[in-house]
């Protein structure tokens, strides 16, 4: 949230992603206190504790980060489940040669996971959460979205190439 270093926006637990609009976000602080909750009428959408733990960890550790995006797309979840992870098989995927990985530790409900998560992310703009999904960060929503769009595109391209059932041509890391 611009001008509020201790606050960020997150989606409410239970609301479908396709239902989200700008007015649906909850504003919470790094301690997990809800600072603003829209009136959802009879629908009492709750607080997303796993989302809070994940997002607040990054915001606290990386003050330059203005936005954290975390997705569970089919392509992202598929690549996150492969031992090989994301391969440098095309120009877009080569942007992620230094991508971070975080091993699955179950549903993120323990604040203790924050330390491991932040250590695994390091200074990277993108991380694959093994057996879970994708995460990108940026100084702005646009920057984080741009990283996510490229990461998602790379995951889709890799799955399409792997479906051809022929050896993949990886690009040399020296390039």
Give residue ranges: language-model regions.
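Glycine-rich flexible loops
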Residues: 1-175
């Amino acid at each position: 949230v611009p001008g509020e270093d201790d606050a960020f926006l997150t989606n409410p637990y239970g609301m479908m992603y396709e239902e989200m609009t700008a007015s649906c976000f909850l504003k919470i602080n790094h301690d997990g206190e809800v600072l603003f909750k829209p009136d959802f009428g009879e629908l009492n959408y709750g607080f997303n504790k796993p989302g809070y733990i994940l997002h607040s960890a990054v915001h606290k550790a990386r003050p330059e980060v203005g936005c954290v995006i975390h997705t569970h797309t089919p392509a992202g979840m598929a690549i996150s489940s492969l031992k090989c992870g994301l391969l440098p098989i095309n120009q877009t995927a080569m942007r992620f040669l230094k991508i971070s990985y975080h091993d699955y530790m179950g549903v993120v409900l323990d604040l203790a996971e924050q330390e491991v998560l932040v250590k695994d992310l390091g200074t990277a703009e993108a991380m694959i959460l093994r057996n879970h999904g994708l995460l990108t960060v940026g100084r702005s929503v646009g920057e984080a979205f741009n990283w996510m769009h490229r990461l998602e595109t790379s995951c889709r391209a890799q799955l399409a190439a792997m479906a051809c059932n022929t050896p993949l041509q990886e690009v040399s890391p020296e390039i």
